[in-house]
Curated annotation (Swiss-Prot):
Residues 156-269 are annotated as: Interaction with tubulin. It comes from the Eukaryota. InterPro entries: RITA1 (IPR031418). GO terms for cellular component: centrosome; cytoplasm; nucleus. A motif (Nuclear localization signal) lies at residues 92-108. Residues 37-101, 141-269 are annotated as: Disordered. PANTHER family: RBPJ-INTERACTING AND TUBULIN-ASSOCIATED PROTEIN 1. Residues 79-93 have a biased composition (Low complexity). This is RBPJ-interacting and tubulin-associated protein 1. Tubulin-binding protein that acts as a negative regulator of Notch signaling pathway. Shuttles between the cytoplasm and the nucleus and mediates the nuclear export of RBPJ/RBPSUH, thereby preventing the interaction between RBPJ/RBPSUH and NICD product of Notch proteins (Notch intracellular domain), leading to down-regulate Notch-mediated transcription. May play a role in neurogenesis. Interacts with RBPJ/RBPSUH.
Length: 269
């Protein structure tokens, strides 16, 4: 019988051996193309690392003194290296302490107010800023969020209503937007078709049940006498579908804007 090391070198005979004996499932029995000596042999023992004095022994030597520390280290290990190391350590320790002290006193360039308010109070100034800059920075933290919300609040409400205007006469969906636009803007030409659409929407709600559209027309178009006449005529005509009503109302509104322009074709399509 071959040893598992020889089987690992051959690589071909390892497969039947893995099925025969259970001990072949280890790394040695497998055919590996890596030099396994890099990971260390399990049978051989690694060389023990050299003995070093723990940190608490060095601290005891520092407190007692350099002479006593060298005598203890030489008695424990019996080597000259420990005496030289223990004698050289006191020169390095004060440098480490000085480094830590310098780190604690170094100025930081981050805004320390994020971690909490300073006990000094209103002292926002740094060594690189002037006194006037510190006051400006303190005031800027609060002024921007308060002013734009109050001043610019009505403007975004009006802009979407103006964008809905071209689609207003052809669709019956933006009814609420047309009512709010009627109250907000009075001197523009755009409210005229919107107010007619409002009257048309009221007739839409009342016509299918009552069958008399002219009764609701005078209520909405009361302040205007000459203009409700064409809309009233178109509503009195015998129509069945609500789409036809919307078309008939939109037709007289377009010639009033432009005398010779004819725009009844897009709604019919």
């Amino acid at each position: 019988m071959k040893t598992p090391v020889e089987l690992a070198v051959s690589g071909i005979q390892t497969l039947p051996l893995q099925h025969r004996c259970r001990g072949s499932h280890r790394v040695k029995a497998r055919a590996s193309y890596v030099d396994e000596s890099l990971f260390g042999s399990p049978a051989g023992t690694r060389p023990t690392p050299p003995d070093f004095d723990p940190p608490w022994v060095e601290k005891a030597n520092r407190t007692s003194g350099v002479g006593t520390g060298t005598s203890r280290a030489s008695g424990a290990n019996g080597s000259c290296e420990t005496t030289s190391s223990s004698g050289s350590t006191p020169t390095l320790t004060p440098r480490k302490k000085n480094k830590y002290r310098l780190i604690s006193h170094t100025p930081s360039y981050c805004d320390e107010s994020l971690f909490g308010s300073r006990p000094e109070g209103t002292n926002w100034e740094g060594p690189w800023m002037a006194k006037g800059d510190a006051a400006k920075l303190h005031s800027l933290f609060w002024t921007p969020p308060a002013t734009p919300r109050g001043s610019h609040s009505p403007r975004p409400r009006e802009t979407p209503l103006r964008a809905i205007h071209p689609a207003g006469p052809s669709k019956t969906e933006p009814k609420v937007a047309a009512d709010s636009q009627k109250l907000s803007t009075d001197g523009l030409d755009s409210p005229h078709p919107l107010r007619r659409e409002r009257s048309h929407s009221l007739t839409h709600l009342n016509v299918p049940r009552t069958g008399r559209p002219p009764t609701s027309g005078p209520h909405t178009n009361g302040p205007r006498d000459p203009r409700p006449s064409p809309s009233g005529v178109t509503l009195q005509s015998p129509l069945v579908t609500p789409r036809a009503r919307s078309v008939r109302i939109s037709v007289p509104a377009t010639p009033q804007r432009g005398g010779a322009t004819q725009k009844p074709k897009p709604p019919w399509k």
